[in-house]
From Swiss-Prot:
<dbReference type="GO" id="GO:0019877">
    <property type="term" value="P:diaminopimelate biosynthetic process"/>
</dbReference>
<feature type="binding site">
    <location>
        <begin position="37"/>
        <end position="38"/>
    </location>
    <ligand>
        <name>NADP(+)</name>
    </ligand>
</feature>
<protein>
    <recommendedName>
        <fullName>Aspartate-semialdehyde dehydrogenase</fullName>
        <ecNumber>1.2.1.11</ecNumber>
    </recommendedName>
</protein>
<feature type="active site" description="Acyl-thioester intermediate">
    <location>
        <position position="135"/>
    </location>
</feature>
<dbReference type="GO" id="GO:0009088">
    <property type="term" value="P:threonine biosynthetic process"/>
</dbReference>
<feature type="active site" description="Proton acceptor">
    <location>
        <position position="274"/>
    </location>
</feature>
<dbReference type="InterPro" id="IPR000534">
    <property type="entry name" value="Semialdehyde_DH_NAD-bd"/>
</dbReference>
<feature type="binding site">
    <location>
        <position position="244"/>
    </location>
    <ligand>
        <name>phosphate</name>
    </ligand>
</feature>
<dbReference type="InterPro" id="IPR012280">
    <property type="entry name" value="Semialdhyde_DH_dimer_dom"/>
</dbReference>
<dbReference type="GO" id="GO:0051287">
    <property type="term" value="F:NAD binding"/>
</dbReference>
<feature type="binding site">
    <location>
        <position position="73"/>
    </location>
    <ligand>
        <name>NADP(+)</name>
    </ligand>
</feature>
<dbReference type="GO" id="GO:0046983">
    <property type="term" value="F:protein dimerization activity"/>
</dbReference>
<comment type="similarity">
    <text>Belongs to the aspartate-semialdehyde dehydrogenase family.</text>
</comment>
<feature type="binding site">
    <location>
        <position position="162"/>
    </location>
    <ligand>
        <name>substrate</name>
    </ligand>
</feature>
<dbReference type="GO" id="GO:0050661">
    <property type="term" value="F:NADP binding"/>
</dbReference>
<dbReference type="GO" id="GO:0071266">
    <property type="term" value="P:'de novo' L-methionine biosynthetic process"/>
</dbReference>
<feature type="binding site">
    <location>
        <begin position="10"/>
        <end position="13"/>
    </location>
    <ligand>
        <name>NADP(+)</name>
    </ligand>
</feature>
Length: 367
């Protein structure tokens, strides 16, 4: 059995990873060692059926004794520890949820239902750094993988509807707190059937604009609104989140020529499911039934939702998908621009295939 160290296992992504590993009995195949950046010496969790104490996540000697390190601790930790470990001669496998190493030449972005061939080639060629991808990119490829695998995609334009969880646990709490403030502000009026809805709306809007809602994490109110910008601003007018779409898609697929991917990334008031609306330029006219067959056959989690109003409203929403590994795709139809133009709408859990699941499956391959 390999010695596997876990850092950042208590955070949101780490907690989902632990839950999935317990469900799949992954701990049966490894010797887990749990680390902490702040609580060393305290009792370690018993996920693996073993007892012990939390180790120091900054102790290079302890880390060097590991065969595999899995970190969900974030980019600052990776930037501090990873170079020191490699410079010390450590030759173990590093599996990371943070974005810091994604675009490095000696790292592979992991999404095995989509790029197992790239992962296998990397392992055969001595690659030892494996990084989870951007959540929207991973979820897009899980849902639309059949089109990419059959070399049918000329370019992709996307508008995202990204959940609060993409920012982190504090962002989710802030969204719910904002919702509570707004409701509490008009609760009496809502309980009075004769109250005027426009008066209620004015009270809500006034509070939203008042500066009284908690916005420490988002910077502006999200409840009852949206934020059409995610991550840093780049010189070309993109947000960094939008830049990742093309950069990471092409690295994951190891394309020989770049597939253009661009669009707008928007934060909305969903909790943990990202949704995306796509305009896809196909390389040739492909019938909708064939498109549906290719998408459904690509991986066990891609589910084609018929382009029917009632079915779509039931099955193609964050409420329906949250907490599941299913990555449904629907609203598939040809657009007025021509027979090569396809619309699609996808939904996926940002914490599962968007974050924890690719890490878990990579660890399973290595262990």
């Amino acid at each position: 059995m390999k010695n596997v160290g876990f850092i950042g296992w208590r955070g949101m992504v780490g907690s989902v990873l632990m839950q999935r590993m317990v469900e799949e009995r992954d701990f049966d195949a490894i010797r887990p060692v749990f680390f902490s950046t702040s609580q060393l010496g305290q009792a370690a969790p018993s996920f693996g059926g073993t007892t012990g104490t939390l180790q120091d996540a900054f102790d290079l000697e302890a880390l060097k004794a590991l065969d595999i390190i899995v970190t969900c601790q974030g980019g600052d930790y990776t930037n501090e520890i990873y170079p020191k470990l490699r410079e010390s001669g450590w030759q173990g496998y590093w599996i990371d949820a943070a974005s810091s190493l994604r675009m490095k030449d000696d790292a592979i972005i992991i999404l095995d239902p989509v790029n197992q061939d790239v992962i296998t080639d990397g392992l055969n060629n001595g690659i030892r750094t494996f990084v989870g991808g951007n959540c929207t990119v991973s979820l897009m490829l899980m849902s639309l993988g059949g089109l990419f695998a059959n070399d049918l995609v000329d370019w992709v334009s996307v508008a995202t509807y990204q959940a609060a969880s993409g920012g982190g646990a504090r962002h989710m709490r802030e969204l719910l707190t904002q919702m509570g403030h707004l409701y509490g502000h008009v609760a009496d009026e809502l309980a009075t059937p004769s109250s005027a809805i426009l008066d209620i709306e004015r009270k809500v809007t006034t509070l939203t604009r008042s500066g009284e809602l908690p916005v420490d994490n988002f910077g502006v109110p999200l409840a009852g609104s949206l934020i059409p910008w995610i991550d840093k601003q780049l010189d070309n007018g993109q947000s960094r989140e939008e830049w990742k779409g093309q950069a990471e898609t092409n690295k994951i697929l190891n394309t020989s020529s770049v597939i253009p991917v661009d669009g707008l990334c928007v934060r909305v008031g969903a909790l943990r499911c990202h949704s995306q609306a796509f305009t896809i330029k196909l390389k040739k006219d492909v019938s909708i039934p064939t498109v549906e067959e290719l998408l459904a056959a690509h991986n066990p989690w891609a589910k084609v939702v018929p382009n029917d109003r009632e079915i779509t409203m039931r099955e193609l929403t964050p409420a329906a998908v949250t907490g599941t590994l299913t990555t449904p795709v629907g609203r598939l139809r040809k657009l007025n621009m021509g027979p090569e133009f396809l619309s699609a709408f996808t939904v996926g859990d940002q914490l599962l295939w968007g974050a924890a699941e690719p890490l878990r499956r990579m660890l399973r391959q290595l262990a």
